[in-house]
Amino acid sequence: MSTFDGNMTRRTALVRGVQGAALACAASRWAPLFAAPASRWFKIGACEWNLGKADPSSLEVAKELGLDGIQVDMGSPKAGLPLRKPEVQKAYLEAAKRTGMGIASIAMGALNSVPLKRDPRAAQWLLETIDVCKAMGLSIVMPACFGNGDLDMAKTDEINHLVKVLQEACAKADKQGITIGLESYLSAEDNLKLLDRVNSPALKVYYDVGNSTDKGYDVLKEIPLLGKRICEFHFKDDGFMLGQGRIDFKKVRRAIEKIDYSGWIQIEAAAPHGMRKDYPAYYKFLRGIYPERG
């Protein structure tokens, strides 16, 4: 997530000529290279805003595309963060049960416009989202820190405020068994500095390989450096089709092997040929590298 704020706003996709069949072919070639231990597992979903939805029907779309589930969002401030409402939570949970789809985590795209680093409303929303996460039987809340919420470690006053906000939120999250996965443009080194200052096991990094590549970071070095402090992944590669751009997802898998990660991978990628064509192809491509189980 970077520019998302309750509505679907992605970078303009760069159309690539190679079709989804090439992705499937590559996945079948790579599959034998990765024999994960039986204890390791991967689920592959998509962010609901990339499915063109902001309601429980996103789970129906995920099922139609052959995914394992979704990352849901709290919703926009203008709409009053709809997921705060018990009836909306219930509707999502009923849709998940009906479709057999999973809900992996809750994103807070609203914090891109109402920043956690200085706006007291954002701090309150984070506390409320922890309660929503617990009520829905989920375990990860993802505050997004882009746009107005972008983090700069050189801006001491903002970072000091953020640390205090996160310490309060983490105290609550830790008691409820919830992880706060902060997503930002910070480097792995700066993420570690921030996590060390907050000093809570409830705070981790929500790692987006596309965002980090955009910033010029080496994701193959950053993933092992962050290690167990990564709680979940976003996969995208600017406007490219997955597997046809800058990021070698086979090498990313090897980096993930080093940290013994099991969990969700959320597709947040461009769809130059349309979401209904490209997302099933992405799933097949990624499944060849990230098997459901070893």
Regions found by a protein language model. Give the residues of each.
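Histidine-acidic metal/acid-base catalytic patches
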Residues: S2-K43, G52-G66, T99, A188-G294
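Hydrophobic alpha-helical membrane-association signature
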Residues: V88, W125, L162-V165, D248, ...
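Short, well-ordered beta-strand segments
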Residues: G45-C47
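Metal-dependent catalytic neighborhoods of phosphoester/phosphodiester hydrolases
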Residues: P82-Q89, K117-P120, R276-D278
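Active-site-proximal loop/turn and secondary-structure-junction residues that shape catalytic pockets
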Residues: N50, M74-S76, G109-N112, C145-G149, ...
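Glycine-rich, proline-tolerant flexible connector loops at the mouths of alpha/beta enzymes
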Residues: D73-A91, F146-L151
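Active-site acidic/histidine proton-transfer and metal-coordination neighborhood
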Residues: G17-A27, S58, L93-S105, N112-V205, ...
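Conserved beta-strand positions in the central sheet of alpha/beta enzyme cores
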Residues: Q71, S105-A107, M142, G181, ...
